[in-house]
């Protein structure tokens, strides 16, 4: 059965939850979020900065087919290897405000794991604005790439 990223957005709330199961050990899934070369490959973005540690920060840049550059960045507030990352996220060219993201990495079996994310937005309007974009489709495609890329590292 094909794995699919699930997004739950309750009406009137300024948060959403994201879950995805992977056929990967939890250590490898965690590595996909903290090693710059792997992040670049599955996210399709350039990593300008990635300090994978408590009080670290990150900045990524994506260029669209027309040459427009989009940057997003944040600060890492909590970092526990193979368990969780708490960070902020800001899309610098958009007016979606700063998000707070809680990423939890859960071992399901010896070779499978699950990513559980909770994202809190400044307002319901900001969350709903993001959901109007091809957010869910893009995230599912990125998670499919993550699985494919990391299959080669197993």
Indicate residue ranges for each PLM-predicted region.
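Hydrophobic pocket/interface hotspot
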Residues: 29-30, 39, 58-60, 76, ...
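Hydrophobic ligand-binding cavity/cleft-lining segments
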Residues: 1-46
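Beta-strand/loop substructures that line and gate deep hydrophobic ligand-binding cavities in soluble
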Residues: 92-137
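Short, highly charged C-terminal tails/helix-capping segments
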Residues: 151-154
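Intrinsic-disorder/low-complexity, polar/charged segments enriched in Ser/Thr/Lys/Arg/Asp/Glu/Gln
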Residues: 13-19, 57, 71, 84, ...
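Hydrophobic/aromatic beta-strand elements that line small-molecule binding cavities or substrate pockets
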Residues: 20, 48, 72-78, 89, ...
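A short, structured loop/turn motif at beta-sheet edges
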Residues: 26, 77-83, 104-114
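Short beta-edge strand/loop motif at the mouth of beta-sheet-based domains
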Residues: 17-18, 36-69, 82
């Amino acid at each position: 059965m094909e794995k699919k990223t699930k997004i739950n957005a309750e009406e009137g709330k300024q948060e959403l939850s994201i879950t995805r199961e992977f056929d990967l050990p939890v250590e490898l899934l965690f590595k996909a979020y903290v090693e710059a070369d792997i992040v670049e490959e599955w996210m399709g973005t350039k990593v300008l900065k990635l300090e994978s540690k408590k009080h670290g920060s990150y900045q990524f840049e994506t260029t669209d087919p027309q040459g427009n550059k989009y940057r997003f960045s944040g600060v890492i507030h909590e970092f526990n290897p193979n368990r969780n990352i708490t960070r902020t996220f800001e899309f610098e060219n958009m007016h979606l405000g700063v998000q707070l993201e809680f990423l939890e990495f859960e071992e399901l079996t010896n070779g499978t794991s699950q990513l559980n994310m909770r994202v809190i937005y400044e307002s319901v309007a900001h969350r709903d604005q993001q959901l109007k974009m091809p957010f869910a489709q893009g995230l599912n495609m990125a998670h499919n790439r993550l699985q494919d890329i990391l299959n080669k590292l197993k």
